[in-house]
Amino acid sequence: MLVFSKFLTRTEPFMIHLFILAMFVMIYKFFPGGFENNFSVANPDKKASWIDCIYFGVTTHSTVGFGDILPKTTGAKLCTIAHIVTVFFIVLTL
């Protein structure tokens, strides 16, 4: 039982990060107006897909931020700021 308890305490922070990442990816994908209208993608001719939303979420969540997908609208910028602040406080508390 002690081994399972240690496993759970080690995987819990990972699961929290995974849940927050999944939540923000869903927000980015179903953002009012669509991902294409709220975020500028490096190739504007290509329709944004789930992979683009996941990619943007992971680069924002990991604080890498390559800059090839950028929030254009005020709402998208505020959502991205909320994602960054959420991750910042999660990292501080875990």
From Swiss-Prot:
Q: What is its main location?
A: membrane
> Which Gene Ontology terms describe the biological processes this protein takes part in?
monoatomic ion transmembrane transport; potassium ion transport
Where are the annotated glycans? 38
In its UniProt entry, the species of origin is given as Paramecium bursaria Chlorella virus 1
Q: Return the similarity comment.
A: Belongs to the two pore domain potassium channel (TC 1.A.1.12) family.
Source species, domain of life: Viruses
Query: What cellular-component terms does GO give this entry?
Result: host cell membrane; membrane
> Which parts of the chain span the membrane according to its record?
14-34, 74-94
> Source taxonomy lineage?
Viruses, Varidnaviria, Bamfordvirae, Nucleocytoviricota, Megaviricetes
What is the membrane topology noted in the UniProt record heading this document?
Multi-pass membrane protein
Q: Which UniProt keywords apply?
A: Glycoprotein, Ion channel, Ion transport, Membrane, Transmembrane, Transmembrane helix, Transport, Viral ion channel
Report the subcellular localization.
Membrane
InterPro entries xrefs: K_chnl_dom (IPR013099)
Q: What is this protein called?
A: Potassium channel protein kcv
